[in-house]
A protein has these predicted regions:
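Conserved beta-strand scaffold positions in the cores of enzyme catalytic domains, especially
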Residues: 47-49, 123-125, 141
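A conserved mid-domain beta-alpha-beta active-site/ligand-binding segment of alpha/beta enzyme cores
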Residues: 139-185
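Residues at the C-termini of beta-strands that transition into short coil/loop
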Residues: 51-53, 127-129, 145
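Active-site beta-strand->loop->alpha-helix modules in alpha/beta enzyme cores, enriched
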Residues: 1-119, 153-158, 172-175, 186, ...
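Short acidic, glycine/proline-rich loop/turn micro-motifs
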Residues: 58-60, 134-139
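Short, flexible loop segments at boundaries between secondary-structure elements
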Residues: 113-135
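Conserved small/polar residues in nucleotide/adenosyl-binding loops
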Residues: 217-220
Length: 220
């Protein structure tokens, strides 16, 4: 504890975190994720932390996607054999980690897309707090009731280490959960103005369609 406090107090800008600090950050973030999952009734045995190598740089800037990252993601998908995969398609993420994670998932999917069980698997991309899909691109719109929107907000708030001053491309000073909630409400309002049913909020998804029979995605 004393060594960690000393390191943090003397750390210089851009300096790599020590192994102890990286471990502490991992424990904090995994604990927050478990708390959020428990809140929305996700069973502990269904929570997996991949600890992808590209992320373990010890600095804000993460590494490039590597073969080991793709293999880890592919192994989990092959183990679970899901009917649906939900992946962050938020390419405006200031740190770029969502883009690398998306690339890892798509590269893994591209390598196993011709497996028989994958024919029944659908891949849905969602946006975070920074932007929303154009309405003509949306392929699945999930209505949220006021209570469901509160549940989403509360689950986001379980990630306490991420609540203040989340980076954003621009001068928007709203907190992450506020931007997310406003985005969901704005999507619902847009559907309402188009003459469709009115809801408190809507979560929108775009489907990723793998092209079967050939390898298109160049993995590391």
């Amino acid at each position: 504890h004393a060594e960690i406090n000393k390191f943090i107090s003397q750390k210089k800008d851009g300096e790599m975190d020590s192994a102890d600090v990286r471990y502490l950050k991992t424990i904090i973030r995994q604990g927050e994720a478990r708390t959020a999952c428990n809140y929305i009734n996700v069973k502990p045995e269904n929570v997996h932390f991949l600890n992808l190598p590209f992320y373990e740089t010890g600095t804000i800037k993460k590494g490039d996607l590597g073969r080991a990252d793709v293999d880890i993601v592919k192994a989990l998908i092959e183990e679970v054999k899901p009917h649906q995969i939900f992946v962050a398609g938020d390419l405006a993420d200031p740190h770029g980690t969502h883009k690398v994670c998306l690339d890892a998932v798509l590269a893994a999917i591209d390598e196993i897309k011709d497996e028989k069980w994958m024919q029944d698997c659908r891949i849905w991309m969602y946006r975070g707090a920074w932007a929303e899909w154009e309405i003509d691109h949306i392929e699945m719109a999930v209505p949220l009731s006021p209570e469901e929107l509160r549940q989403k907000r509360n689950s986001i708030l379980k990630h306490q280490s991420q609540m203040e001053n989340a980076p954003f491309l621009g001068d928007d000073e709203r907190l992450f959960w506020q931007r997310s909630e406003d985005r969901n409400r704005a999507t619902a309002e847009l559907y309402s103005r188009l003459g469709l049913a009115s809801y408190e909020a809507i979560e929108a998804f775009v489907e990723y369609h793998p092209i079967r029979g050939c390898l298109l995605y160049t993995s590391p």
